Amino acid sequence: MGDWRTISLPESDKILQYSSEIRMSPTSLLSSPSHSAANTLSGIVYNFCTEDNIEQCITYIDQELRTIGFPTVQAVSKNGDGRKLHLVSIVNCIHELLQRNSQNMRSKEEVETQLLKINGDLEHLQSIYQRQKDQMEATRRENCALQERDRQMQCKNRNLLQLLKNEKEEVQKLQNIIASRSTQFNHSVKRKEREYNKLKERLYQLVMDKRDKKISIDVLNYVGRADGKRTSWRTGKTDAKNEEEMYKVLLNDYEQRQKQLMVENAELKKVLQQMKKEMISILSQRKTKEKLDDSIGPVASDIEEDLADSSKENLSELSCEAVREQLVSSIRQQWRILKSHMEKLDNQATPDENGMIARGDHEQELGKLINEIQQCKETIKIQQQLLKQQFSVPRDDTSTLLQDCYLLEDKERLQEEWKLFNEQKKNFEKERRNFTEAAIRLGHEKKAFEEDRAAWLKHQFLNMTVFTDHKNSEEKRAHGVHFSPEQDHCRLHSRTHDRHLASSGDHYQRPRKTLPITPSSKHSLTQRESVAWRDSSISPNGTDF
């Protein structure tokens, strides 16, 4: 009996043999078992059976075949001397073994073919999995972009709703102002109608009183007409006709006079309202333009309503001279308030010695810069966290190559972002320097503008001719000098024109500093133009301010 011997192979040899067998084609598999079997059989023949132990080998093979289920290969000899080999049994056993070997080889080939199919399916599934993973990543990025776009659209929608709400409020305010103005206009029309009726009745009374108290001298020797025609006889009909014509002429004259007075009154009211609005805008301490526009409307409407109420109460009882005096006194009061306020501004018009930018603007700009730096820091922290998460995730054998590719792409993209960040940082530093220079230049411009404004206001208030013109008008009125509406209107326009020329000449003669045009300088120019237009405004009594 021979001993069983087991051959132990290293794990690397097994793996190489397994991998080589997997990658072999079925045709090579069909040919390879025969060669390997031949090699192994030749080794077993030379190692297992020799001439010395042939009997023992035959006995061992017979026992093994019987244990497997084959018939014995030895038969008893007829002589009874011993056992001999039975060739038929040996051939049958060999044939059966060959059949089983061929079946095992076919089953092995089938298993190997199935293994190849399974490996191919596995690779296909891995490729599908990787493609689905890439699609999922792209879908996730697209979803994030859509969410960001949705958020921006919602913010824009909220801003538009807020603007719509503000516009509706403005429309409501304007509608209320229009309604109040319409009611004031209706009241003024009714008041004018009542005044017209009263003046008509008073005119009729004056004419009738003069007719009753008329003292005349009859002409005995009447001089003939220049054309040589005879004069008509004076009868009751001719007298009535002449009186009617006289009344018609008087009524036409009074109507024309009333129309002219109404036109002049409307113009003077417009000038007065404009002056009051400008006074209120100057006297108000609001800083921003929106607040100023919102505050001028209600305050001016209140003042106009007060003035309209006072004029409604006193206009029917006072004459034109009294109304003019009342308007002049109100304008004087407003100008006194304006003068005191301008003197205060003149005292406060001295700017800082350094002429630097205001502290509030500087702090606001610093706050913006700090917010931008904080956002950059947060972005860098988020990127670092993402990089740590990517490095901390355990790598599988299948995803190592893909992770390396992703890391290379992320590294390149990060380098590009760093380059862009450095460029933005340089641009930001450049803009910061430009802003500092512009702030310094703006401080100098503001200082120069305040000096010019203080000097100009001082010159204007020192050369005011409101009270002197008013005294001259009172002296002329005391001496009985009266002007017709046409003469008053011409005098008004001539003084307006002269005053406008004088003020424009003063502006042109005064030296100015040439500075670069900035938003603040544009605002200062608009303020100067508005002040010059206010100087060319005219008071109701014919004097200019």
From Swiss-Prot:
Its main location: other. It is found in: Cell junction, Adherens junction; Cytoplasm, Cytoskeleton, Microtubule organizing center, Centrosome, Centriolar satellite. InterPro entries: Adhesion_Centrosome_assoc, Afadin/alpha-actinin-bd. Residues 106-287, 358-442 form a coiled coil. Keywords: Cell adhesion, Cell junction, Coiled coil, Cytoplasm, Cytoskeleton, Microtubule. GO terms for molecular function: microtubule minus-end binding. It holds the Pfam family ADIP. Residues 517-529, 536-545 have a biased composition (Polar residues). PANTHER family: AFADIN- AND ALPHA-ACTININ-BINDING PROTEIN (PTHR46507), AFADIN- AND ALPHA-ACTININ-BINDING PROTEIN A (PTHR46507:SF7). Belongs to the ADIP family. Belongs to an adhesion system, which plays a role in the organization of homotypic, interneuronal and heterotypic cell-cell adherens junctions (AJs). Involved in cell movement. Acts as a centrosome maturation factor, probably by maintaining the integrity of the pericentriolar material and proper microtubule nucleation at mitotic spindle poles. The function seems to implicate at least in part WRAP73; the SSX2IP:WRAP73 complex is proposed to act as regulator of spindle anchoring at the mitotic centrosome. This is Afadin- and alpha-actinin-binding protein B. The lineage of its organism: Eukaryota, Metazoa, Chordata, Craniata, Vertebrata.
